């Protein structure tokens, strides 16, 4: 599956790590540049650095995603990311 994860703190990172072991293609959207660099160097994922806005979700290719997982610490950001992800074409959102 093609999966986009928004937010790669403790929870998002753990989800990405687990899904990689299951053989999924993962793209991570992370707003913190240091965290994005860390993820890029430790996991075999595509990292899109920036906030989870429409432009960044397009860059993350959400339109082709089977699943978008919003895992930020902000409920508002998670909800909006899922709504935008659906509008852009993500098959499922969490």
What are these regions (language model features)?
Residues 1-94:
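Cytosolic regulatory regions of ion transport systems
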């Amino acid at each position: 599956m093609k999966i986009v994860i928004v937010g790669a703190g403790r929870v998002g990172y753990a989800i990405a790590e687990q899904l990689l072991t299951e053989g999924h293609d993962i793209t991570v959207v992370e707003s913190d540049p240091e965290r994005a660099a860390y993820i890029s160097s430790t996991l075999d994922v595509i990292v899109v650095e920036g906030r989870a806005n429409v432009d960044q979700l397009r860059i993350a290719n959400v339109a082709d995603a089977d699943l978008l997982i919003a895992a930020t610490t902000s409920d508002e950001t998670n909800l909006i990311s899922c709504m935008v992800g659906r509008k852009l074409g993500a098959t499922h959102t969490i």
